[in-house]
Structures are given as structure tokens and as C-alpha cells.
Amino acid sequence: MTLAALLADALAPSDDKGPWLFWLISGKNEFWQMKPLQKENWEMFLRGTRVALTMIGAALIMYKARAFKLGQPVPQKLARNVAILFTLLGFGVYFDYFNPNTRYSEYYHRHEFYHYYLGSKYFQEVGYKRLYECTAIAEIELGRAANVRKRDIRDLRVNLIKPIIDTEVVKDPKHCTAHFKPERWSAFKKDVDWFYKSAAGNYWENMIKDHGYNPPPVWTMTGKFFANMGDAGDAFFKYLASIDILLHLGAVALLVWAFGWETTAVGVVFWGCNKAADFYWTGGAFLRQDWWFFLVAALCLTKKKYFFLAGFALMWSTLLRIFPGIFF
């Protein structure tokens, strides 16, 4: 069987719930019900693993440098095998080793997808200011007016949380709907309704108190391309969340190609163990790791002397997040 065929089988829908691989890492798989894999126990294991990877990894680097200085270099094959092991462990720890008990039940992050899927798909209509207002108006038209009027909303024009009854949502719904063609408004309401049904309660109501849709225009171009491939839904969002996994794998492959396994292990362990960007904060997302992939690509392409491609990758990463520009 070819690699392409294996990937096709792995990503084939399972009971209309998305890629088959996601069933393996979902709470529906009885494997994850074992006591050592439950959240409290697993989080303790992850903390220990992160500390061990960083401390032991640092010790091994110093040991190798010391051995080389003494004229007793570590065998290349052994160093490579240890580096591969640390790369695998570092990569896995970022994803909590795909244990569903420590993250979002269906892998993808609904709060994230509400903002970036809807925001990019309907950017022409909602722009940077109208996502929350249009969401509330859609809910009113879907028959939930009494409930909507009781909520608060962040007014993105002034960055203040206000009662919905004091905003344009109730006073002038056309402030939003005038930007939509009828078929696009119907599609928007359908997508909003899916989010409401899948994330009802305080979780849903608090989404419109966040800080709105905020990616730069370059990200919006890519996000809109993928978002318009399907309606809001469990299976489709799992496919979109898969993009970041592929970007992670691609970045690791580039590091191996350009720098070898030892440098790759250092980079992957650092990325996998840093608390500021752990999976709970950045995982299960929609194209959140694109800037990182292109930044890594720029460094690797520079190492291999593909300067034009490296410049393009660094430019794209900078357009996505601005701060990679410090590497120019």
C-alpha cells in the first residue's frame, strides 16, 4: 500500500465525524478510559516529562561537548538515535501525547473556530468590527431574541462590554444585514446556529465578549480559502484542525533536512515544553501555526542557501505575525 493510500484511509470520515485518526484520539476510544490516563494523573505525568526532557536533554548536550573535548566523542549512531527519541518525545508532549482527557473533547477549539472560521469566511461582510453584532442579530432571527437581549456583548468599535440592548444589534439590525447578500446571510445564520448548538450556555455567551476577529489581511486570504470549503460542522473542523498538525510535521521535517537530528531535537523539545505556547493555549486551532512553519522554513532554507525562497518564507511569516521581522 502506498503512503498516499495510507493517508487516505487515515483521514477517511468515520461515521461522518471527521478523520478516522481523530476517533483514535477521542474520548470515544475506550483506551483513554484507563485510570493512569485520566486528566489529573496525565497532567502530572506531562509536567514530569517536560522537566525531564529539558533537564536530561541539557545534561546530554553538555556531556557530548565534554566528551568531544576529552577526545572521546559519542558514537554518531548513538547520538542520532537519542536525538530521534527526544524529537519524538518533544513533539508528542506538545500535543499532550494526544490524550483527549486533557484537552477539547473533539480536539478542535470551538472558541477559536468561532472567531477565525466565521471571521475569515465572512470577512467581506463582517470585517473586523461586526462579527459579534451579526452573530447576535442572527440569533434573534433564529428565534432566540428574548435570550439574546439579556446578554452582554463587546462593542468592538470602542472595545467595551455593553448590554446588547444598548447596541446597534437591537436598535438597527440593518447595520449588519445590509452588508450581506440574502444567500450569504442564510449561510451565516446556519453556521452561527451550529456554534450555538455545539457550545450552548456560558461558553457560547462569553464568546461575544472576547476581542473579535483580529488576524492580518494575509492570514485572512488563506483562512477564507479554507473556511469557504465547507459549512460549520464537527467533521469539517477536524479537517481544518489537521492543517496545524501537518504544519508541525513539516517544520520538523525541514529542521531534519537542514540541520540534522540533534539540532532538531533541541528545537522540538524547546517548542514542545514551553509553557507559554502549550497545547491548551494554541492547540486544536485553525491555521495558528502557519507563521511558525514559515519562520522555521526561512531558517532552514537559509542554511541550505536557498536565499530567495528563504526570503519569501520570512516575508510571509512576518506578514502573518509581524514579530518574525526581527530576523530580517
Describe each model-derived feature in a short phrase:
Residues M1-S14:
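N-terminal secretory/membrane targeting signals
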Residues D9, G18-F328:
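Multi-pass membrane glycosyltransferase architecture that uses lipid-linked
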